[in-house]
Amino acid sequence: MHDLLETVAGAGVDGGQTPPAEAWSARAWFAGGERIGYAPRSRAIVASEDAPLRIFLRREGDPAQAVSFLPGFPDGSFGWAKVLSYLPNATDMPKLFLDYVGMGDSDKPKDYAYSTSERADLVEAIWPELGVQSTTLVAFDFSSLVVLELLRRRLERSERGEPAGGPDIRGVFIFNGGLFTDGHTHPWYTTPMLRRLPNWARRGVGRPFALFKRTPGVRKLWSEGYQVTDAELRELHSAMDRHDGLFYLAAAAGFMADHKAQGDRLDFCHIYKAYRDQFPFLVGGSDEDPFEHRQVDLARERLGKFGLRIERLPGGHLTTNERPEALAALIAKFERGTTIRPS
């Protein structure tokens, strides 16, 4: 299995090879990583044997200059599996992937306060532990809010006269993510409904697989023209169901409400203008994304005149699954240009 993963990662964009289908399985993806200890109260990575929780981490190459790939909802780090197959190899582009608490191969406690803030805490704990000195932030879906939280914290620390903390940031790449509180367009029967489920009902979400694959909200992840297969749906289900984790669909579905509650603090216009002269930004979206399709239009309307780079790709919300090669090409091109600062 390790040889298979090495071959796939090594092919990359330059290799021009189509990876074998088994490289895109949840089992292969998680076999290529590790579970490390995490103490949320102290916001620190700790020895695994003493850890209250264990989180999934996958590294490709030297972490000192790694690109930080932050996961989307609901597929977690596994969502990057196809994209990785088309990215430059680990030497040309070191990479760091992770699952937040509750996602993928990380532990999934039922009595945990899931939020944007605790996700940012985890990212900030991982960076120094791995010796990350410089990074490009690549965020998909709700990790856009984690990026906004991380950048806002640095501004707040600076205002208090404290060190910004964390690695130097080379650039910020956000795709199909929420940026503006008035731009969320999630259909009512998806996250808005899920977040209102009582705790007792959350454990039955997504079960059995036969019900999961017929759930309207799940089908909405892909464009109407994309013929998602049972095999793809089963791999998604497998990644989400690890460690009895399907309840996370409802437990973490409050991220939009979280965003709206902190709308002023996580205002993308202010954050972008504060950093635009320090490193480049790219905001992208899919043509048929039903969840965040207004975000790109609002970004262009509000920040296009200030130099924000905006890109679109065809397809539905799960660009990582539906258009992995095109998304990988955008990411690789952006990372190559991160040494060029906006004028």
Model regions and ranges:
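Conserved HGGG/HGGXW glycine-rich cap/lid loop of the alpha/beta-hydrolase fold
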Residues: 56-105
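Catalytic active-site module of serine/aspartate enzymes centered on a nucleophile-bearing elbow/loop
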Residues: 304-343
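Short, well-ordered alpha-helices that flank and scaffold nucleotide-derived cofactor binding pockets
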Residues: 82-89, 152-156, 298, 329, ...
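Flexible "cap/lid" subdomain of the alpha/beta-hydrolase fold that forms the substrate-access gate
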Residues: 2-44, 55-59, 78-79, 96, ...
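Solvent-exposed amphipathic alpha-helical surface segments
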Residues: 90, 130, 157, 334-342
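Glycine-centered tight beta-turn/hairpin loop motif at sheet-sheet or coil-to-beta transitions
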Residues: 48-54
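Conserved acidic functional residues
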Residues: 72, 141, 321
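Short hydrophobic "strand-cap" motifs at the C-terminus of beta-strands
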Residues: 70, 284, 315-316
